[in-house]
A protein has these predicted regions:
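NTP/phosphate- and nucleic-acid-binding module
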Residues: 14-474
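N-terminal amphipathic/basic-hydrophobic helices that include classical n-h-c signal peptides
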Residues: 1-20
Length: 474
């Protein structure tokens, strides 16, 4: 059940009462992201390319913060995890062994008038048919005819058929079938084919995991909802190797870990719902999967998952490659193929959820002004602190502001210097990009070494001694 995303808060600031809400539409987020340099349409100069987006300076900073937090939490701070960065291009036999060349398909229909293609399950869901992806191709075709469903342009639709979503490409100068490979549709296979390499290099005890964050490519028929469903995206993924008899224990462990992660990046646990995927909808490699879905304004959608992949991948790669991928327990001398728990975190989707969660609008009770701000956690915010000279045409103020800026830059890294426009406009600009604190250097600073520190969420301004500034910003 989707709950209301509306939240009302109030706080006193400069004698004005702010009335705020986090009820954000997709249109508002898209507008803010482009205006403030988070995310731009891909190839916009040439009319764009559907399903592609470019991350601007603030967007890539936000994405890197999330990625670094994830890596620290699941690799650096653990003693049972090994990081990898496998190639995007892989031998095509990898995808044959994994099953992707046969079953990595989506159901599609054609507009019989224009030739435009659409995801059949999406059209059915848009017309009130729930869990359409669990239906067979024939069931989808029958429902489209029975319900009289048309294309978005109002034209008749073809029968439903499958479409393989992998991007094929050629390797080298040869134009032959054996030169064909694919842009990877998932990061997982790069970890499975390196399982033996890591075991031979590090001799880890079970359970242990491999971690990877990287780009994936899927030829989506109907990219939609901004960066939620795109043709190029980043996934942060773990493959956790366990004994078969222990899979349920570690499945629950990683199930709980998702909520710890969500809290760390600032998501409201009440807006995250678990979907225990029905058996008929499971991926070909999975025996059990739980999707973690977040309440976006356009619906409750998946942003992560935990799957029990059994020994499907290692067993199939062992069979197709002819290489023994079993594991030798050095304590018991047992040899067996480990089973796998796979926690998956969609980086772009997690970022999208953080943007939606953080968006606030506030109107001043005593004026018609509206304030928009992003209530990022400090660890997530692309800019940690902004430093202002009160006036840009006063060299003494600018010099002192530069001195404070340099000091904070060494401590936090993500610090900006801003002297463009009046102080109110600078505050609003930093609010919209989610900067937690602004530090203003004024004439009093020159006399007593104090500065004004403004809090983003409350708008409250405090006078702070420079020697206590780090503590005030923590």
């Amino acid at each position: 059940m989707t709950l209301s995303m509306k939240r009302v808060t109030g706080s006193w600031c400069s004698n004005f009462l702010y009335k705020g809400m986090s009820d954000v539409t997709l249109e508002k987020l898209v507008s803010l992201c482009k205006r403030r340099g988070f995310i731009y349409p891909g190839s916009e100069l040439y009319g764009g390319l559907a399903g592609t987006f470019d991350y601007g300076p603030l967007g890539v900073a936000l994405k890197n913060n999330l990625k670094q937090m994830w890596w620290k939490q699941y690799v650096d701070d653990r003693d049972d995890m090994f990081g990898l960065d496998s190639a995007i291009l892989m031998n095509s036999s990898v995808w044959e062994a994994s099953g992707h060349t046969d079953v990595f398909n989506d159901p599609i229909v054609d507009d019989t008038t224009t030739g435009a293609r659409y995801r059949a399950d999406h059209l059915l869901e848009d017309n009130g048919i729930e869990n359409a992806e669990a239906l067979s191709l024939q069931q989808m075709t029958d429902l489209i005819k029975e319900k009289g469903i048309k294309s978005p342009e109002g034209n008749p639709l073809s029968d439903v058929r499958t479409f393989n979503m992998m991007f094929a490409t050629r390797v080298g100068a040869r134009d032959s079938d054996d030169a064909t490979t694919y842009l990877r549709p998932e990061t997982a296979q790069g970890m499975f084919v390196n399982f033996k390499n890591v075991v031979d290099s590090f001799y880890p005890d079970l359970p242990f995991g491999l971690a990877q964050a990287g780009r994936n490519f899927r030829n989506e028929i109907s990219p939609r909802e901004f960066i939620f469903r795109t043709r190029e995206f980043e996934i942060m993924e773990l493959e956790y190797f366990v004994r078969e008899e222990d899979w349920e224990k570690y499945f629950e462990m990683w199930r709980n870990e998702f909520f710890i992660w969500a809290e760390n990046i600032g998501l409201d646990a009440k807006k995250i719902h678990e979907l225990d995927v029905p058996s008929e909808e499971l991926a070909h490699y999975s025996k059990r999967t739980i999707d973690f879905e977040y309440e976006f304004s356009f619906g409750t959608k998946e942003i992560g998952a935990v799957a029990y992949r059994t020994d499907f991948d290692l067993r199939n790669h062992s069979k197709h490659s002819g290489v023994d991928l079993s594991y030798m327990d050095k304590h018991t001398n047992e040899r067996f193929i480990p089973h796998v728990i796979e926690p998956t975190f969609g980086l772009d989707r997690n970022l999208f959820a953080v943007l939606a969660e953080s968006y606030r609008e506030e109107s001043l009770e005593e004026s018609n002004e509206k304030r928009v701000y992003l209530s990022f956690k400090k660890e997530v915010a692309p800019v940690r602190v902004a430093v202002f000279p009160l006036l840009k045409n006063k060299p003494a103020l600018v010099e002192k502001a530069r001195e404070v800026f340099s000091s904070l830059k060494k401590q936090y890294g993500r610090v900006v210097f801003d002297d463009n426009g009046n102080i109110g406009k600078r505050y609003r600009r930093q609010d919209e990009i989610g900067t937690p604190h602004c530090v203003t250097i004024d004439f009093d600073t020159l006399d007593d070494n104090t500065v004004t520190v403004r809090d983003r969420d409350t708008g409250k301004q405090d006078r702070v001694a420079l020697k206590e500034l780090t503590q005030a910003l923590s």
